[in-house]
Amino acid sequence: MKPMAMHFLSGGRVRMRKTVYIPDADRSESIELPVICTLLRHAQGNVLFDTGCHPDVPENPASRWHGMEKFMIPIMPKGENVLSGLSGIGVEADDIDVVICSHLHPDHCGCNAFFRKATLMVHARELEAAQAPEAQAVAAGYLRADWDHPAPAMTPVEGETDVMGDGRIVLLPLPGHTPGMMGALVRLENSGAFLLASDALTRGGQRPIRQRPRCLRNS
């Protein structure tokens, strides 16, 4: 069987106040965060972990994010998105067989609608959270325009889920940042195991803290 390949692609870049992640940081400090999408080229098909920001965000952030851009400021240039990243390695949207949504914030599911032929997997608790009435507030972090599409239809999953049935891509519940956030444990033949943790860990150097960051929620 052909070894699985893993490609990291840019889904955008944002700037946020550092206190969102580290409560005791200086309030004047900000941090730049890459939005990472991951393509897994499995023998049974192409699997994409997260789809990043919508292509319209760099030029029209307010019309796309409806106020969310005030605290999650997009800083990537036009054309920096997962679609162009895929195209650069010879993969088009219709070549993707499975899309895994770590969670349904717009910097992680913004391009979902472009993958019309894919099976789209999301944790059942995450879908429930995004559909809740209170999720319509900007502060909740969900935008229906980015995740609620007739195609591809969402496939809710619960617990650990073996995506391809061979143990190479296993979805793991990682609640905290959102109620139904998931990571993916990826096992490569030559390089070993990797955990795609999404926003469960946003930057190196994070440490035990005295206060709960605003980016975490009780789950």
How does the language model describe each region?
Residues 60-122:
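Active-site metal-binding motif and surrounding structural segment of the metallo-beta-lactamase
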Residues 63-69, 138, 208-215:
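Short glycine/proline- and charge-enriched loop/turn segments
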Residues 74-95, 124-173, 217-219:
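Metallo-beta-lactamase
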Residues 1-7, 166-170, 190-193, 201-219:
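Accessory terminal helices/loops
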Residues 4, 13-83, 184-200:
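Conserved beta-strand hairpin/beta-sheet module of binuclear metal-dependent hydrolase folds
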Residues 17, 56, 104-109, 179-181, ...:
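Active-site environment of divalent metal-dependent phosphoester hydrolases
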Residues 8, 37-41, 47, 159-189:
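Core dinuclear metal-dependent hydrolase active-site scaffold
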Residues 48-51, 97-103, 122-123, 172-176, ...:
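Active-site neighborhood of phospho(di)ester-bond hydrolases with catalytic His/Asp-centered motifs
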